Amino acid sequence: MLKVAIVGASGYTGVELIRLLLNHPQVEITCVTSRQNAGASIDSVFPSLAGRIDLTFDPVDVDTIIRKSDFVFTALPHKAAMAVVPAFLHAGKKVVDLSADYRLHDVDVYEAWYDKHTSPELLDEAVYGLPELYRQQVVDARLVANPGCYPTSIALGLAPLLENNLIDAASLIIDSKSGTSGAGRSAKVGSLYCEVNEGFKAYGVASHRHTPEIEQTLGQLAGKPVQVSFTPHLLPVNRGILSTCYASLVQPMDTAQLQQLYAQRYAGEIFVRVHPQGELPNILHVRGSNYCNIGVVSDKRTGRVIIVSVIDNLLKGAASQAVQNMNLMQAWSEDSGLSDLPLYP
C-alpha cells in the first residue's frame, strides 16, 4: 500500500481527497494536516467521514510528513505550497500540488498575478496535470501541478479545435459559471447563504487569476500565444462548473462534423464524454464524479463554434483529477478509485 499524506486537508478539496483515497484499493492515508484543526479528529471536523478514518489532524511539520508518507498531496493556499514542496521532493517523495504555485512556467507571469515565487527552479520541471493532454509527461513526473477548475473545463472543451487549427484563437471568448464551493470553506460574507441564494453575478472580470493559466495551456495547444476574454460567474449551487466557449471557425463546419471531431479526439478517454449532436451538458450530470461532459454546436449564421463543457469543480476540477494524476505517476490503472458514477439527482 502506498502511504499518502494530504497537506492542508481542512477545506472542501481536502475532504474530497480523503473520501476518494479511503476508497482507493492501493492507498493508505497515513498523515493529514491542518493548521487550524491540528489535534482534532478528522471525523469531528468532517462528520461525513464518521467511522471511516481514525486519524487526527497533524500540524504542518515537514519532517513528520516525510517520515509518515511516500506520496504527498499539497492542498495548501497559494504561496504556502512552495514553502514545503521543495523539501518533499528533496526527500524523494512524489508530489501532486493542488495550488497554483507550479502551474505557470514563467516566473514573471506568476509574480504578476500572484506573489513572489520562492522556488522558481521547479517551474520548468513541474508537469501540468491534465492527463487528457499531457498523459506521458504525468507518468514520468515527480512533481505535478494539478490544474485549476476553470482551466480544466476550458482546455478540454477547446483542445480538439486548437490542436487542429480550426478556430481563430484571437477570437476566443469564454464565459464560465461555478458553484460556491469554488470559493473555499473559509467564512466570508460573499459566500453566505443570503448573499448567494437566488442571485447570479459575474466576478473577477478581466482579472481572474486563472486567466494566465488558461492562456498558457491554450497557447500550447495552438502552438502560438493566445489571449482570451474570460468572465467567471458565481452560481447559487454547491458544486459544478459550466464553461461556454465561443470562437470563429477558420473554415465552415457543421455541427455533425464538429461532433465527430470531438468524439474521435476523446474516444479513448474514460473521463471525457462527448454528447451526441443536439444534446448539451448539464452540471447535474457530472456532480460527484471525475467526468467532463462536452457538447458542441456550429452557428452557421455567424461562422462561430460554441462549446459547452461541464465538470464538478471539486473533483475533475481538483481532488479526483489529483488522484487520476497519482494513478498515472504510480503506473496504476488510471481510473483506480475513481469509478463512481455521478450522483443523480
UniProtKB/Swiss-Prot annotation:
Domain of life: Bacteria
Keywords: Amino-acid biosynthesis, Arginine biosynthesis, Cytoplasm, NADP, Oxidoreductase
Gene3D superfamilies (alphabetical): Dihydrodipicolinate Reductase, domain 2, NAD(P)-binding Rossmann-like Domain
UniProt signal peptide: none
Places the protein is found: Cytoplasm
Keyword Cytoplasm (UniProt): yes
Family (UniProt): Belongs to the NAGSA dehydrogenase family. Type 1 subfamily.
Purpose: Catalyzes the NADPH-dependent reduction of N-acetyl-5-glutamyl phosphate to yield N-acetyl-L-glutamate 5-semialdehyde.
Protein name, as recorded: N-acetyl-gamma-glutamyl-phosphate reductase
